[in-house]
Amino acid sequence: MTDPATDTTRRNVHDHEVAKFDAAASRWWDPQGECKPLHDINPLRLDYVAQCLGGLEGRRILDVGCGGGLLAEGMARRGAEVTGIDMSKAALQVARLHALEMEVEVAYRQITVEELADSDEPRFDAVTCLEMLEHVPDPASAVHACARLVKPGGHVIFSTLNRNPKSYLFAILGAEYLLQLLPKGTHDWQQFIRPSELDRWAREADLVLRSMKGLTYNPLNQRYKLTDDTSVNYLAHYQHSPARAGS
C-alpha cells in the first residue's frame, strides 16, 4: 500500500526538488552555508510581512514551503501562532528540532498546500508562501490553495523570481555560478514567474494586490534591500477580496 506521506505522483510536487531540500536540510541553520542567502534576506522578509499585516502579535499564520523554519520561527518569535508546511521530511525534522532547542512554538506538518486547503483546517489570518512557487509544477494551483486558506479579508504574501533575461543573468549565472551564493541547480529559470502571471492567478482566486516590492543584492557590500525594481526577486502582498465574506 502506498504511503500517503510519500506518494507524490498526484500531488503538486517535484520529487527532485524535494530531494534537493532533503539533502540540504542538515545545513539549513548554518548562516555561512548554502542557505546563507535565506539567512541574509530573512530580516527583510520578516519586516515586510509584519508591515503588510500591521504586526504579527496574535496573528494565526500559515507558512507554505517552510523548509527548515527560518521564517516560521521568526514570525513565532514576534508573537504569531505559526503553522509551517513542507514536503521535505528532512527539512521538517530540522525545523522541529531547532524550534525545540530555541524554545519556540511552531506546528510543522508534511502536507501540500492543496491538501491542507481541502481539509477542515480553520482558516488563517495570513498565508506566507516565500521562495516556493518556482519549485512546484503547478504554481497557479498553489496560489489558489493559499487563497482558500485565508479568512475573508485575510492576507497572502508571495515571493518568487521574475522570468526574463536579467533574472537569468543575475539569479542563475550570477548567483549560482559566478558569485556561488547558491548551489548550482538550485533554480530552473523556466520555472520563474512573471509578476503578471502571478497577478493573473491571484485575481482568479479573488486576491487583490496591495503592494509589490523587489529584492536586490549588492555584491560589493553583500547586502540585500527592498526596492521598486521587481525585475529579478520580488515580494507581493495580496488581500482576499472582502466580497468573499458575503459569499
UniProtKB/Swiss-Prot annotation:
Binding site for S-adenosyl-L-methionine: 45, 65, 86, 130
EC annotation from Swiss-Prot or TrEMBL: 2.1.1.222, 2.1.1.64
Keywords noted in UniProt: Methyltransferase, S-adenosyl-L-methionine, Transferase, Ubiquinone biosynthesis
InterPro entries per UniProt: SAM-dependent_MTases_sf, UbiG_MeTrfase
Reaction(s) this enzyme catalyzes, per UniProt: a 3-demethylubiquinol + S-adenosyl-L-methionine = a ubiquinol + S-adenosyl-L-homocysteine + H(+); a 3-(all-trans-polyprenyl)benzene-1,2-diol + S-adenosyl-L-methionine = a 2-methoxy-6-(all-trans-polyprenyl)phenol + S-adenosyl-L-homocysteine + H(+)
Gene Ontology BP, a term: methylation
Any Pfam family the entry gives: Methyltransf_23
NCBIfam families named in the record: UbiG
Family listed: Belongs to the methyltransferase superfamily. UbiG/COQ3 family.
Described function: O-methyltransferase that catalyzes the 2 O-methylation steps in the ubiquinone biosynthetic pathway.
Protein known as: Ubiquinone biosynthesis O-methyltransferase
Organism: Alkalilimnicola ehrlichii (strain ATCC BAA-1101 / DSM 17681 / MLHE-1)
Gene that specifies this protein: ubiG
